[in-house]
Amino acid sequence: VKLMCGIAGVFNFDKTKINPEITNIIKNSLEHRGPDFSRIDYLSDYVALIHTRLAIIDLDYRSNQPMVSNDKRHSIVFNGEIYNYKEIRKELESKGVVFSTDGDTEVLLEAYVKYGSDVLNILRGQFAFVIYDSLEDSFFLARDRVGIKPLYFSVNEKNLIFSSEIKAIENSGL
């Protein structure tokens, strides 16, 4: 079994409070993917991001996820590897972006803050990520073009749920 991070999240459209039992079920369904660290962040009553971490590039705790952008507006959960993150980082630093980690997650997040969905045009690698924009109250879901890193989602009249594994969505009961 190849290890990799696990990502997931829940968004209740009617803004009702997320049941913590459900997010714990989702996290527990993904913990085998990321043995190094796991966390659920409730960004509001109705928005939760979940991450189980397999630390590869930056082992520092500051690279734990979900991660929040410098502007405090955006939050990310990310699974994968951005091969050209050092080049992207240099470009962003030349535009005044300051980084607090050495890994590719923060680079990806700040690149999204700078370029929006156009960030997909500059990324090289294998990835699945979701960014929540607290100002717009919206999600941006993306994965690499080949689909090396999985990202599944389900939308119904009540909520959006996404995950690295279908099993986590099914286990949630949503």
Model-predicted segments: where are they?
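Cysteine-centered catalytic environments shared across enzyme families
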Residues: K2-L174
